[in-house]
């Protein structure tokens, strides 16, 4: 007759079996969630792509109709700006310094998004000598997030390596993947503030070819680098990513 197995050993085996089953179940559920999240992210990307194409087609139609009737097509005013700090703190007034802190531009070559309204436009004009800014395309937003994107989780700077980082940071407001995040920023959606605050300021590099000391002091419209450069900001970002 085989010796009786001590009760303590039986309990230990039962506990180990339970832990093993729980681990397998957790692994299975995690894989299922990952598949579901991936499917949802693909669906979101397809939905937004269709939306972007429809908007572009509508703009083309409006331009053609305006031209056919001898009128002018006036596009909607930009709602989003990308700001890049190009100068240090020497000679910066306390007010300008406070505005740059508000926009989270604490270092040279930091870049952040800002929602354009009367208040932010006034603030941008006050800091024009120290920054350059303009209107980013969807492609530029994508490149910044994919190549230089870091999120803020528990006050820590975390690389956006996959959608799980986005889900943890802003999933509560329905932003669950890169496509959601890009769409919220590009369209300046209802949860723009949460999306923008989740993003750590982008750390760009000195542009290929560099900024000269003289051109940084001159407005873009006068041949320099500072101030509003409109859609030309996209060319600059390509040189700084």
Where in the sequence are the language-model features?
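Core subunits and conserved enzymes of cellular information-processing
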Residues: 2-241
């Amino acid at each position: 007759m085989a010796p009786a197995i001590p009760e303590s050993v039986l309990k230990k085996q039962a506990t180990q079996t339970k832990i093993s089953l729980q681990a397998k179940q957790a692994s299975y559920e995690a894989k299922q969630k990952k598949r579901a999240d991936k499917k949802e992210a693909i669906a979101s990307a397809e939905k937004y792509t269709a939306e972007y194409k429809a908007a572009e087609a509508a703009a083309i139609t409006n331009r053609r109709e305006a031209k056919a009737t001898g009128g002018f097509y006036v596009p909607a005013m930009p709602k989003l700006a990308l700001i890049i700090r190009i100068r240090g703190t020497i000679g910066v007034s306390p007010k300008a310094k406070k505005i740059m802190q508000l926009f989270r531009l604490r270092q040279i070559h930091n870049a952040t998004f800002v929602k354009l309204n009367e208040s932010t436009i006034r603030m941008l004009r006050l800091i024009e000598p120290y920054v350059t800014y303009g209107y980013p395309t969807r492609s530029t937003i994508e490149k910044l997030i994919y190549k230089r994107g870091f999120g803020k989780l528990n006050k820590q700077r975390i690389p956006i390596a996959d959608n799980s980082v986005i889900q943890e940071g802003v999933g509560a407001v329905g932003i669950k993947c890169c496509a959601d995040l890009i769409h919220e920023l590009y369209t300046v959606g209802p949860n723009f503030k949460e999306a923008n605050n989740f993003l750590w300021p982008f750390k760009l590099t000195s542009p290929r070819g560099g900024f000269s000391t003289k051109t940084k002091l001159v407005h873009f419209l006068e041949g320099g680098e500072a101030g509003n450069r409109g859609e030309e900001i996209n060319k600059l970002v390509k040189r700084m990513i």
